[in-house]
UniProtKB/Swiss-Prot annotation:
The keyword Transcription does not apply. This is dITP/XTP pyrophosphatase. Homodimer. The lineage of its organism: Bacteria, Bacillati, Bacillota, Clostridia, Thermoanaerobacterales. Its cofactor is Mg(2+). It comes from Thermoanaerobacter sp. (strain X514). Its EC number is 3.6.1.66. Keywords: Hydrolase, Magnesium, Metal-binding, Nucleotide metabolism, Nucleotide-binding. Pyrophosphatase that catalyzes the hydrolysis of nucleoside triphosphates to their monophosphate derivatives, with a high preference for the non-canonical purine nucleotides XTP (xanthosine triphosphate), dITP (deoxyinosine triphosphate) and ITP. Seems to function as a house-cleaning enzyme that removes non-canonical purine nucleotides from the nucleotide pool, thus preventing their incorporation into DNA/RNA and avoiding chromosomal lesions.
Length: 198
């Protein structure tokens, strides 16, 4: 079975290849197939963005196409930054810029009102079928960054049942509980089911 990932990110490709090690699945990135175009994410939701990327690539290739998008949703901010998570503080914002903006908006807000969740959506597009798979991780936003690992909003996202921020976890610990791991596990189950049908 051939799976093509709608990404230019080598880390994402590697991560998914590792997930399917030992299975009769060939995984390719856009770079592997010489597709250099950037896909504009113009959707109003992360679901729409994942589908936009997958549909764009499906028009160019055979096989199963997958694409993902992730957002951080803060209850007190009516679900912001959401679909704008990567560019919350502006078009070329750094992770630090985004975290600073988020903490500023939540200044003085008590801990119990700082509930948030990460959500990753994986769109799977086949010839006749589109499927959305979702992974979620719930927690709270801290009032200052903690930890040196990870990236993005990890230093300000507190995982209550572990008593640590995502940036205080090792990669192995994070990969066991993350929204991304949750979505990838659902993808794996989906693909294994498809393999059984063949």
């Amino acid at each position: 079975m051939k799976i093509i990932i709608a990404t230019h990110n080598p880390h994402k490709t590697e991560e998914i290849k590792n997930f399917f090690k030992g299975y009769p699945v060939e995984i390719y990135s856009m770079a592997d197939l010489g597709i250099k175009e950037d896909i504009e994410e113009t959707g109003d939701t992360i679901e729409e963005n994942a589908l936009i990327k997958a549909r764009f690539l499906k028009e160019k290739v055979d096989g199963i196409v997958i694409a993902d998008d992730t957002g951080l949703f803060v209850e007190h901010l009516n679900g912001q930054p959401g679909v704008y998570s990567a560019r919350f503080a502006g078009e070329n914002a750094t992770y630090e810029d985004n975290n600073k903006k988020l903490l500023k908006l939540l200044e003085g807000v008590p801990y119990e009102k700082r509930k948030a969740y990460f959500k990753t959506v994986i769109a799977v597009v086949e010839r006749e079928k589109e499927t959305l798979l979702e992974g979620k991780l719930e927690g709270h936003i801290l009032d200052h960054p903690r930890g040196k690992n990870g990236f993005g909003y990890d230093p300000v996202f507190y995982v209550d049942n572990l008593g640590k921020s995502l940036a205080e976890l090792t990669m192995e610990e994070k990969n066991k509980i993350s929204h991304r791991a949750d979505a990838l596990m659902k993808l794996k189950n989906y693909i294994l089911k498809r393999l059984e049908e063949k």
